[in-house]
Amino acid sequence: MKPTNEPKKPFFQSPIILAVLGGILLIFFLRSFNSDGSFSDNFLASSTKNVSYHEIKQLISNNEVENVSIGQTLIKASHKEGNNRVIYIAKRVPDLTLVPLLDEKKINYSGFSESNFFTDMLGWLMPILVILGLWMFMANRMQKNMGGGIFGMGSAKKLINAEKPNVRFNDMAGNEEAKEEVVEIVDFLKYPERYANLGAKIPKGVLLVGPPGTGKTLLAKAVAGEAHVPFFSMGGSSFIEMFVGLGASRVRDLFETAKKQAPSIIFIDEIDAIGKSRAAGGVVSGNDEREQTLNQLLAEMDGFGSENAPVIVLAATNRPEILDPALMRPGRFDRQVLVDKPDFNGRVEILKVHIKGVKLANDVNLQEVAKLTAGLAGADLANIINEAALLAGRNNQKEVRQQHLKEAVERGIAGLEKKSRRISPKEKKIVAYHESGHAVISEMTKGSARVNKVSIIPRGMAALGYTLNTPEENKYLMQKHELIAEIDVLLGGRAAEDVFLEEISTGASNDLERATDIIKGMVSYYGMSSVSGLMVLEKQRNAFLGGGYGSSREFSEKTAEEMDLFIKNLLEERYKHVKQTLSDYREAIEIMVKELFDKEVITGERVREIISEYEVANNLESRLIPLEEQAS
């Protein structure tokens, strides 16, 4: 949706501005009257002069004034000079000789009220009117931005414009299964009569689910582009505003506009903003505006009056588990299409799409980049290509080289390299032992990812060093020994500090937290312990947003104590095993630490070389895990 380009009115044609100016003029006009309805002297005078009371009395004594008006706090004396009338105004002071003096000089005098009914009323009403005017002005501006006036309830019609996307399926890569699922939708939209003649009902809606950055919006645009139909897009949060009923009104307007241009596609991004379940834990939620909007969406998707106007609703979310069951039933969202993170081949194809227009050197190997980026989404890969191009430009290079791509991958995974951050030799030594411990355990533990690089250069906000592990492929299942291997690798850093420095630091805090979470999952969710057996103790949170496990406790205090004891014992058992492994390879780790201290970075190949040379020199049986067994 794009806002229409409506001509703006000139500033002084705004009704609110004109009303304010009119009110100011009215005040000046009403102030020209006395309380008896006659024009005030100030209005008839050519000029007024503020003088002292003594001067006014002197003018009266010299017979230089014609009329005197006496108020409660002011005294006015008028004097005519040729064709001009001058009014002298002074603060009144208690003076019993004034009236006798006026009688003696035979000067006309009278009393006057210093305020009148009109100005008194305006004095009370004007602040209220100003506040009301400002509120109406701000509310009107806000509602215009939302698609309507203050009393127009923000009609969505002014915001809706149909797009004709130029995106095609060929512009997408890495989601072949998802594309196959929606190809049929394109056929429905192109040839609706073919299916109508067979008595088939066209699907009302397709829900695209998957992690952030996997191309759900792009896929929806590609469907519209392939079918050559109008594409209406709106974010879920755009339906709900401060006025109750506005969301339902916008849903009606959106579907009405789409039906007029049918066949067409409506795309609702982040539909969980309006489609959240109305009951959570058996208690009905109380957001009336969202519920009205959802009810209207359900009614529209039931297709009242739309049998001959094929409008297909595509929606995207990364939180399908919280959507209302009424929204998910057949007849509304008939299908769910998983748009997942790409596998190795998918990443290669996505990289090929994003390198179009980028000048690449001959040494660029996209397969190697794809191996380094397991678990990343399409948006991450696009960012890596762009970051590599920026790095090449920053270094005044004419082409993007493989090194730029590798640096971009590391930057995306570990954060920006902080070469300016100076750490003391003592801390540098601690970090070198810590990262060497991670690297050695990773290379000698079956089921762990292969080491690609070890660095003690600070990166990101907190990392003083890092070990870059690159799994050969995405993992969809984890066996128990693989979880144990991950725990061992996480404990390797702290164990190395303990073995070689005989003192531990705070650098392993995140490693310990992650190791604890893995064991907690084994106990409470995966049924991999004697504590729970096959019983699930906690529910997993959002699968696509990485929410971990729920905090609701569905077990007794005794079970909680047993769980804590199991986690503690397993951590101690694996820590003891890791310390023993590092002690067995003490000299190899010392060599690794020295090279890290001198060079700051060593490759995974060099790590494996150091371990292998140590084993040969000491006639040890190799404990290095071969590549084909590394993640099996």
UniProtKB/Swiss-Prot annotation:
Q: Which cofactors?
A: Zn(2+)
Classify the main location: membrane
Q: Where does Zn(2+) bind?
A: H434, H438, D511
Q: What happens when the gene is disrupted?
A: A homozygous disruption strain was not identified, suggesting this gene may be essential.
CC cofactor note: Binds 1 zinc ion per subunit.
Entry binding sites for ATP: A173, G213, T214, G215, K216, T217, H354
Q: What is its EC number?
A: 3.4.24.-
Where do the TM regions start and end? 10-30, 117-137
* SUPFAM superfamilies the record matches: FtsH protease domain-like, P-loop containing nucleoside triphosphate hydrolases
One example GO MF annotation: metalloendopeptidase activity
Membrane topology, as annotated, equals: Multi-pass membrane protein
Location of the active site: E435
Keyword set, alphabetical order? ATP-binding, Cell inner membrane, Cell membrane, Hydrolase, Membrane, Metal-binding, Metalloprotease, Nucleotide-binding, Protease, Transmembrane, Transmembrane helix, Zinc
Does the UniProt entry include the keyword Transmembrane?
yes
Q: Tell me which Pfam families the record gives.
A: AAA, AAA_lid_3, FtsH_ext, Peptidase_M41
- Provide the function of this protein: Acts as a processive, ATP-dependent zinc metallopeptidase for both cytoplasmic and membrane proteins. Plays a role in the quality control of integral membrane proteins.
Q: What family, per the record? A: In the central section; belongs to the AAA ATPase family. In the C-terminal section; belongs to the peptidase M41 family.
Name of the protein this chain belongs to: ATP-dependent zinc metalloprotease FtsH
Q: Which organism is it from?
A: Helicobacter pylori (strain ATCC 700392 / 26695) (Campylobacter pylori)
Protein's gene: ftsH
